[in-house]
Curated annotation (Swiss-Prot):
It comes from the Eukaryota. Residues 190-199 have a biased composition (Acidic residues). Residues 136-229, 262-471, 483-514, 527-609, 629-769, 782-812, 835-1005, 1070-1099 are annotated as: Disordered. Residues 166-185, 211-223 have a biased composition (Gly residues). Residues 329-343, 590-604, 790-799 have a biased composition (Polar residues). Residues 632-646 have a biased composition (Basic and acidic residues). This is Putative uncharacterized protein DDB_G0277255. It comes from Dictyostelium discoideum (Social amoeba). Residues 262-322, 344-387, 397-464, 489-499, 527-548, 563-585, 647-707, 727-769, 835-984, 1070-1098 have a biased composition (Low complexity).
């Protein structure tokens, strides 16, 4: 159930009318309602208690009436979904008929009336549909686009300037009236019976509307547009040469002294009556006070129903009612509309056949293009007719009863008379008959209500006549300036004036004022904004209250509000506001509160920029933009403070942590490399953290940790809520490292971070300076301590070396793995964990990030399934054991490998050491991990599948930093490693490959720092197996090759794919180093996996250094120099 703003209706135009489907021509039935309104929505505005509608399909007769109750906004809304079953898989057309349960036809306004769409197989080009919101009473920007009755009409249908051509129709009236063909009962039995140009009446009967005998489409005769053009030219010249006073005199003369013209007119009417047998003319007044049917179709078909009200009949002249004339009405030219009433104006397509639809919209009755044709049809009377219009537009309306019915009858008679006059056999009589037909047709509209005498036809003539300006859209633009220069004394808008007076007693008096409704809506909207700003002052409400005088769109005679009325409205609105201060308050729209919320929370920040006039005009010109996009300024942005704990829930939110970013498909998270996971990637990190499910990355857990950095507040967020089988508690996740590194990083409130996000150009870290500080503290906090491993402590080149490795303490929460070696380099996440460390444990080089788990050897995590729990174990187990926990020889434990230095294995993997091979023999520790993580698809190693898993990272689409490794093993430095080469560094080929994808550092200074660290610390760990001594040897050359690249630089992976962030940040770093090589090792074991990295999951598996520095891709030089 959807509605649109009161006071507006949605006009939908179908540009392309026919498409081919399965080699057959099919009429399009789908109408896309723009502005968030579903295809099947139709909106009514009425004061009646209920309305019933009928809908009939063209293939299967499915007709039914349904009563609708109006909502509290006074609108009738319904969702109509028609199932088309059986063979009717095409797009059937079905006209829609409305009828009020009560006979208050003058109290209903059709806001949107069109062919109700049925979703069909046929695809419709987007360009073929055009939707626009049009204020009630305003004429739309373009004339109606009618459905052609038959394929032949398509040929003659051209741009809208040619829309009113008579087409290539037959001789005058030889093809008969539109519905002469009649309607066959029962509909069509089979889809093969479906023919182009069929129309269905309200009873579900198929009516032939094609050209030919009985058809409605072929009756239109020759070109009208040339005559129209010449008439306009004559009118232009006569206007320039004639003063208004002379025009008035000539008009009076033509009205009072042309008895011969009236006689001719009566003769023509008698001829028409002989053909149609139902129109009686007495004296100069047509329809005197008699109830007559004006639409010839109805008499012929007997299918149409004409509804009579108290004094007059409301009749709808169909497009095809030529009244015996030789030509089709002007506005009908090449369109036999598939609606059951005439589409008389561009506002509302009325159905076109035998049914009578008494509910004409105000704008409908206001526009009658045939009258314009009558006015300008002859050179001699064009000026007098113009003056007639001028006089009538300034005179008040005298009709007192059902204006809608009178306007419809006038329009029908005018169209019939225009067609008859235009088809007169002699050119001399055509000029004389046109003026008389215009005056007589105008008098017919008022005769039913005011019983005027024959001499008073001019005074009451066009109570429903449109003014010249209303027809301006039918006049070439080149003539607009000339016509607009005429000083016509119209009160108010010419577009609305004529028929508004007639409607005083229906819509404007008996139904809620549409402008008042809009005023109320805007006032409520503004007041809601003011209440959010804690400004509930009456003054602010008054300022926001826009009177009708201030609204040019609504400047109609009936919109003016007295000061007292405005005060009453304001008081009522204030009372309503007090009752509805909840977020789900309805803003004058009948949409359910759960679907449409008044902008709240942070939305008030923009309230100063909201101008109610702009708001209203924006809605009026919205085009295809959704109303929700204007009224509900992106709920995802307004709820930033709501879902602090649900960072992952809203993909649009920047939630305070980068994590979200990662999650966002946008890959905004370059930082995290680790993040790659992004939801998509499964990349270990996030996925693991959040769902371990992804596992893909064996390292999952590890990576997961990385994400944690990005999470807003691990203690309160979903991140801390592990499943029951997981042993990691939120407190353990929040436990800072014993290293002072953690203390240097403080968690910032999500609100301040959200502000930083809006200001910071970086897509990743919210606070670069804090990261720089943490790195600085991390580097300075490193003190030389002995390593508690079977291998000797890492030698330092000099006793005064500024960068030293922290001691690895099996009992501490710090990551015992040698990965701590890199902790000095890695940035610290918001939770204080080093981004990379754990990765080593993960065998899979997940240096990345894992940190969060720190405690847990990433490997364990991996092995242990996504559960980071393992990590804890690892820590307590002193790394080696940890692996055991994983069962699958956590690489670290070497158990399976028998290699004592779990770290070394990891390190090797991460760094270059192919050592893995040794440990697992074929299964590098990583592989073991893989095995452990059967869950993790990633376990590439063991599982050849792993490749795919690795791809996971790739899945990120390369957007994630890790993506380098993407499925194509994108960067597999591994290739070299596949041979189980122990020292990647030794492999010159590897160096070349590494240089192919160099990481990007924010500043070259950071690269120098890393080189210094590596120069001073080369780890030589002796494994029990002398054969494979893990050897950390970073080639200075290879690191030096990692030169800073420009921000938008792109890196090509081994598969030739360019990896860049959507944001334009080159996120890729991983591979770059020897690390990948290690991963390769894994692959070596399982060369199949190639993904090597896969297991590692984190493509980032590359050097933790790189993954850490990645986030610093845009650091100001001063902060780096301090390091």
């Amino acid at each position: 159930m959807t509605t649109i703003l009161k006071g507006y209706y949605l006009k939908v135009t179908l540009e392309n009318r026919i498409v081919k489907h399965n080699g057959r021509k099919v009429y399009l039935s789908i109408v896309e309602h723009g502005n968030g309104i579903p295809d099947h929505a139709l909106i009514l505005k009425t004061t009646a208690k209920c309305v019933k509608f009928s809908v009939c399909l063209s293939i299967r007769s499915q007709c039914g009436w349904k009563e609708l109750d109006q909502n509290d906004s006074g609108e009738l809304t319904f969702d109509l979904k028609v199932e088309v079953t059986g063979k009717s898989q095409r797009a059937p057309l079905f006209p829609l008929i409305f009828q009020l349960c009560e006979k208050n036809y003058d109290q209903v306004t059709l806001i949107s009336k069109s062919v109700i769409p049925v979703k069909a197989i046929t695809k419709i080009p987007k360009k073929s549909l055009r939707a626009e919101l049009v204020p009630l009473g305003e004429s739309p920007t373009k004339p109606p686009q009618a459905f052609p009755a038959s394929p032949s009409d398509l040929i003659s249908s051209k741009e809208y300037d040619d829309e009113f051509d008579g087409g290539n129709g037959g001789n005058s009236g030889t093809n008969g009236d539109g519905d002469d063909g009649g309607c066959s009962l029962g509909g069509l039995a089979d889809e093969n019976d479906y023919e182009d140009g069929m129309v269905i009446d309200e009873n579900g009967n198929v009516c032939s509307s094609g050209s030919g005998d009985g058809g409605g489409g072929g009756g239109g005769g020759g070109d009208i547009s040339p005559k129209l053009t010449s008439s306009l030219n004559n009118l232009k010249s006569s206007i320039s040469n004639t003063s208004l006073s002379s025009l008035g005199n000539s008009l009076n003369n033509s009205l009072n002294g042309t008895n011969s013209q009236m006689l001719q007119y009566q003769q023509q009417q008698q001829q028409q009556q002989q053909q149609h047998g139902n129109l009686n003319v007495s004296g100069n007044n047509i329809n005197n006070n008699r109830d007559t049917n004006v639409s010839g179709n109805n008499n012929n078909n007997n299918n149409s129903t004409t509804t009579t009200t108290t004094t007059t009949t409301t009749t709808t002249h169909s497009n095809n009612s030529n009244m015996g004339g030789s030509k089709k009405p002007l506005n009908n030219s090449n369109s036999n509309i598939h609606f059951l009433t005439n589409q008389q104006n561009s506002d509302t397509p009325l159905s076109n056949s035998s049914s009578s639809t008494p509910t004409l919209s105000p704008a409908q009755s206001a526009i009658s293009s045939p009258t314009l044709s009558n006015i300008i049809n002859s050179n001699s009377n064009s000026t007098s007719n113009l003056n007639d219009l001028i006089k009538d537009s300034s005179q008040p309306s005298t009709s007192t009863s059902t204006s809608t019915s009178s306007s419809s009858s006038s329009s029908s008679s005018s169209s019939s008379s225009s067609s008859s006059s235009s088809s007169s056999s002699s050119s001399s009589s055509s000029s004389s008959s046109s003026s008389s037909s215009s005056s007589s047709s105008s008098s017919s509209s008022s005769s039913s209500s005011s019983s005027s005498s024959s001499s008073s036809s001019s005074s009451s003539s066009s109570s429903s006549q449109p003014t010249l300006n209303q027809h301006s859209k039918y006049i070439p633009k080149s003539l607009h300036s000339s016509l607009s220069s005429i000083p016509i004394n119209n009160k108010e808008n010419n577009n609305n004036n004529n028929n508004r007076d007639n409607r005083d007693k229906d819509i404007c008096t008996t139904s809620p004022n549409l402008n008042d409704s809009i005023n109320n809506t805007l006032d409520l909207f503004n007041k809601k904004i003011n209440s959010n700003n804690n400004n509930n002052n009456n003054n602010s409400n008054n300022n926001n209250n826009i009177s009708s005088q201030e609204r040019p769109l609504l400047n109609s005679p009936h919109v003016q509000l007295t000061h007292q009325q405005q005060q009453q409205q304001q008081q009522q609105q204030q009372q309503q506001q007090q009752q509805h201060q909840q977020q789900h308050q309805k803003i004058g729209m009948s949409k359910s509160s759960s679907e449409l919320q008044v902008p709240s929370s942070n939305y008030h920040k923009q309230s100063d920029d909201l101008n109610p006039l702009d708001f209203l005009s924006a809605i009026a010109t919205m085009g295809s933009n959704s109303l929700s996009s204007i009224l509900c300024k992106d709920d995802s942005k307004t709820n930033t403070n709501k879902d602090k704990d649900n960072n992952n829930s809203n993909s649009n939110k920047d939630s305070s942590n980068n994590n979200n970013n990662n999650n966002n498909n946008n890959n905004n998270n370059n930082n995290n490399n680790n993040n790659n996971n992004n939801n998509n990637n499964n990349n270990n990190n996030n996925n693991n953290n959040n769902n371990n499910n992804n596992n893909n990355n064996n390292n999952n857990n590890n990576n997961i940790n990385n994400n944690e950095d990005l999470l807003p507040n691990p203690g309160s967020s979903k991140f801390a809520k592990y499943s029951a089988d997981q042993s990691v508690s939120s407190s353990s996740l929040n436990t800072p490292l014993s290293s002072p590194i953690v203390k240097s990083q403080s968690y910032q409130q999500p609100q301040s971070q959200s502000q930083q996000r809006s200001q910071s150009p970086l897509p990743l870290h919210n606070n670069i300076s804090s990261i720089n500080t943490s790195i600085h503290n991390a580097i300075n906090s490193l003190k030389p301590k002995p390593l508690h491993l079977s291998s000797p402590s890492i030698p330092t080149t000099s006793p005064d070396a500024p960068y030293r490795l922290p001691s690895l303490n099996s009992s501490s929460n710090n990551i015992n793995n040698q990965s701590d070696y890199w902790s000095a380099i890695n940035p610290i996440n918001s939770s204080g964990t080093n981004i990379t460390n754990n990765n080593y444990n993960n065998n899979n080089n997940n240096y990345n990030n894992n940190n969060n788990n720190n405690n847990n050897n990433n490997n364990n995590n991996n092995n242990n399934n996504n559960n980071n729990n393992n990590n804890n174990n690892n820590n307590s187990n002193s790394n080696n054991n940890n692996n055991n926990n994983n069962n699958n020889n956590n690489i670290n434990n070497n158990n399976s490998n028998s290699n004592n230095n779990m770290n070394s294995n990891n390190n090797n993997n991460n760094i270059n050491n192919i050592n893995n091979n040794n440990n697992n023999n074929n299964n590098n520790n990583n592989n073991n991990n893989n095995n452990n993580n059967n869950n993790n698809n990633n376990n590439n190693n063991n599982n050849s599948n792993s490749n795919n898993n690795n791809c996971n990272n790739n899945n990120n689409g390369g957007s994630n930093i890790h993506s380098l490794n993407n499925s194509s093993n994108s960067v597999n430095y591994n290739n070299n490693n596949n041979n189980n080469n122990n020292n990647i560094n030794k492999d010159k080929k590897n160096k070349k490959k590494l240089s192919a994808s160099t990481p990007i550092f924010g500043e070259s200074n950071l690269g120098d720092i890393i080189n210094n660290v590596i120069d001073e610390h080369q780890l030589n760990s002796n494994n029990n197996n002398n054969n494979n001594t893990p050897h950390f040897s970073f080639n200075n050359n290879s690191l030096k090759e990692l030169k800073p690249l420009k921000r938008k630089a792109s890196i090509r992976n081994s598969s030739g794919g360019v990896i860049t962030n959507e944001n334009g940040w080159t996120t890729i770093v991983n591979n770059n180093n020897n690390n990948n090589n290690n991963n390769n090792n894994n692959n070596n074991n399982n060369n199949n996996n190639n993904n090597n990295n896969n297991n590692n999951n984190n493509i980032s598996s590359n050097l933790p250094i790189i993954s850490g520095l990645l986030s610093l891709s845009k650091v100001d030089s001063t902060s780096v120099d301090k390091l």
